[in-house]
């Protein structure tokens, strides 16, 4: 199995050899099917270093790899990783000792857009099965439950309700990058979460009415209360809490978490939208010397470079302590989106967290845990793409 790399944190390769003089690293970065003998066409970098400390040379490769890892989300949950082959050759000042590389580069590497914390040490590998930190998920009533897993280690995912198995999916390993992360859902369909999304996905037109809303609030086609994620060594249990919200329109936010996987989070309560406008101004000369007059309907104070940006403030609803980690990863994420559903389309909006500081709440100290997070759209109001 390939070694995992989380490229938002440094990743070091150490080559050790008696009397080593220089080391040359060739990095092959690519998607698709893994090949042990990397093609020259996939060679992205060649680095050569001379020995500084006798006996070994160290390369840091995470930033180089991340240049070729592009994360996108358009509503589809896909595996977004890259294969890396790190081939190292050395020269020695004398002798013919064998070089060793740490971590072992024999089976190559699979790079995720994840990161480790300071206290997790160098070259953090993190979980090799479940690709999320929380063991509780708050889901909107009648919405999908989506569990991101690493297929190189996970063997199965089972969904339970009241102790009865609703669905079990076996997870298979793959040599293709498009199957390294699998998003397992209770429905078996990755991309449709709610009744509204299912209507739009089927090409229908969504008609809203109080009777229909009341009916939808009374049913739940994907109800589960536990999910078991199994590897060869252990099983992790995730508790599912279903939330019924009748007053506000819940919003689904999707972000890349610390494991480099897409993760959903519902904001159940009140949301407020606003627009901020910025512009430059100058005082124009509107006097006409030929007539010794000026037009009183003409702007003396002129605006230019006028631009706007939309913002939205969301409230999570009432959570438990387990979601403090989710909030942290959301604010640390560099790719965040929310899904907006109209009568005929499902639109994914890229956003940036404006909230840069958070005080973590606990049920012991605060009783009810609700977070208010501000976001702004990751694009200008007026199209200025050139």
Predicted regions and their residues:
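Extracellular/virion structural assembly segments
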Residues: 2-12, 16-20, 168-178, 185-189, ...
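Preference for solvent-exposed, low-hydrophobicity sequence contexts
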Residues: 1-246
